[in-house]
Amino acid sequence: MSIASDANEMQGEIARFRHELHQEPEIGLDLPRTQEKVLKALDGLPYEITLGESTTSVTAVLRGGAAHASARKPAVLLRADMDGLPVQERTGVEFSSKIDGAMHACGHDLHTSMLAGAATLLAERRDQLAGDVVLMFQPGEEGFDGAGHMIREGVLDAAGRRVDAAYGMHVFSSLEPYGQFCTKPGVMMSASDGLFVTVLGAGGHGSAPHAAKDPVTAAAEMVTALQVMITRQFNMFDPVVLTVGVLQAGTKRNVIPESARFEATIRTFSEASRERMMTAIPQLLKGIASAHGLEVDVDYRGEYPMTVTDEDETHTAENVISDMFGGSRLSRWATPISGSEDFSRVLAEVPGTFVGLSAVPRGVDHTTSAFNHSPYATFDDGVLSDGAALYAELAVSRIATLAAGN
């Protein structure tokens, strides 16, 4: 039977595993229950297992048993992230989160269950593989740089040498119709940086602002000035997104506080714009503070680089998708999206690509459905077997071409 047929036979099993994961989401780098579930799913399969030291990651290596013509035995990496979000679930599904304040609102439970399904599909084809497969079950994608932790601990060399190609996948609860696969060569997702600003003034009575140094008005001016700077100083065809999500000052309406603070997320799509933001923002904010006779502390933190996919590996994935599911289920995005991913760290080290998969519930309008990270984000189980099949087929197909010297 084909990989797709075998995956369809496993649909119920993969869905049950996904529901188990969904009911017990964990956040960050320490996911002991999730790790235990993954290890149970891999139990009895011929994988070499390595557990993370700084995280509860799982790295599983399958040694292919077929002969290979290449001088160097190829290796391919498949990645799934495993962590949830600090969100109170409001979907109402039967398998809703049992953990207060935690939810798999970004679909990582689907990624993990699909890769676990692919582990079985690949193990059944071990003798056909002329190379090795590295499965990367990663904690801490949601702001904890789990990929960076795993790279530092050697996941890219887990097969005994650097992997030749790497593939990741991400489901969406909106954006595209149900079952649609999405690709984009080159810059696919933005870089993500954090901005943390504290404006330092001198407190006083609200009735006598002249006798104080008001950090609130200066902070408000900074927030609006940042948006003006972007529209005046940056090319509209090389977009920059800056959103202030935290703005805090004071505790009483008639008291001028000593400080005000705000935090922002910054998304860029080129290294030139990213580097320019790193210098332009402190310059602007310090200028405003100086004009008001205040001090300002500007902490600009580089977080994740752009997700840049390899053109050849993207074509490989597109061909596999078209062959397995038909060309009508493949969309190539014309522009990047402003979300960010720490799989970008993997793609900065080895050639690879990232595939989107719409899990919008069937019958729901993808243009109005709740987006990832929403407490109402709902993902359709129906894509699980397709995702597992794609993971497995990507490894099988790419190892075959690499072993043939291509």
Name every feature range the model reports, one short phrase each.
Residues 74-77, 132-134, 163-167, 220, ...:
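Structural motif
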Residues 21, 60, 78, 108, ...:
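Divalent metal-coordination and catalytic microenvironments
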Residues 1-104, 109, 113-129:
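Acidic/His- and Gly-rich active-site-bordering loop/insert found
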Residues 85-87, 91-103, 109-110, 122-246, ...:
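Histidine/acidic-residue-rich, glycine-tolerant segments that coordinate divalent metal ions
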Residues 10-17, 30-41, 74, 102, ...:
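General structural feature for long, well-ordered alpha-helical segments within catalytic domains
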Residues 220-406:
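Metal-dependent amide/peptide-bond hydrolase catalytic core
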